[in-house]
Amino acid sequence: MAEKRNIFLVGPMGAGKSTIGRQLAQLLNMEFIDSDNEIEQRAGADISWIFDIEGEDGFRKREERIINELTQKQGIVLSTGGGAILSKETRNHLSARGIVIYLQTTVDKQFERTQRDKKRPLLQGVEDVRKVLEDLAQVRNPLYEEVADITLPTDEQSAKLMASHIVELIDNFNS
């Protein structure tokens, strides 16, 4: 079985980070933490509200602080927000403190998975959601690739299968 090294999931919104992360933590008997949920709990407000009040910069500063703190824990599976990798400091913390898995997805699949989700501040009130997703991918995908130890496409398999596959990859990665 994989040793209890931290596992950090990165990737765009709608890639399945939270869903796969929960399954993975269960398989490995590790604690699962979703950084977005942690931010909301500590702020006592949802992310959309934080974006409205503090702007994206304010949110990113909160996110950077909280991820810095969370990545210092031991034996966790951490699902990060899609934009967490925009911070060089966050990328450095992720790389230094665990195995980083980039959950890759296509813009088409993202569009399909996020179109009914009202909790995506970067997609609120947007005319052309697909264009926003494409623009985000252009900026962020190279950063996900830069920080990743392992890259996995998530479009075709269930979260349970993905989690099992990650366990195998981590065993190989650790040996």
UniProtKB/Swiss-Prot annotation:
Domain of life, per UniProt, equals Bacteria
Which residues of this UniProt protein bind Mg(2+)? S18
For the biological process aspect of GO, one term held by this record is: aromatic amino acid family biosynthetic process
- Which keywords does UniProt give here? Amino-acid biosynthesis, Aromatic amino acid biosynthesis, ATP-binding, Cytoplasm, Kinase, Magnesium, Metal-binding, Nucleotide-binding, Transferase
Q: Which Pfam families match?
A: SKI
Could you tell me which pathway this protein works in? Answer: Metabolic intermediate biosynthesis; chorismate biosynthesis; chorismate from D-erythrose 4-phosphate and phosphoenolpyruvate: step 5/7
Gene3D superfamilies in the record: P-loop containing nucleotide triphosphate hydrolases
Read off the SUPFAM superfamilies from this record.
P-loop containing nucleoside triphosphate hydrolases
Q: What is its EC number?
A: 2.7.1.71
Q: Name one GO molecular function term.
A: shikimate kinase activity
Question: What is the top EC class of this enzyme, as a single word?
Answer: transferase
Which residues are ATP-binding? Answer: G14, A15, G16, K17, S18, T19, R120, Q157
Its localization reads: Cytoplasm
This protein's GO CC annotations: cytosol
Q: What cofactors does this protein use?
A: Mg(2+)
Q: Where does substrate bind?
A: D36, R60, G82, R140
Q: Paste the cofactor note.
A: Binds 1 Mg(2+) ion per subunit.
Enzymatic reactions: shikimate + ATP = 3-phosphoshikimate + ADP + H(+)
The record's CDD domains line, in alphabetical order, gives: SK (cd00464)
The subunit field of the Swiss-Prot or TrEMBL record says:
Monomer.
Family under the similarity heading = Belongs to the shikimate kinase family.
Function as written in the Swiss-Prot or TrEMBL entry: Catalyzes the specific phosphorylation of the 3-hydroxyl group of shikimic acid using ATP as a cosubstrate.
Question: What is the name attached to this protein's record?
Answer: Shikimate kinase
The record lists the organism as Mannheimia succiniciproducens (strain KCTC 0769BP / MBEL55E)
Instruction: State the taxonomy lineage.
Output: Bacteria, Pseudomonadati, Pseudomonadota, Gammaproteobacteria, Pasteurellales
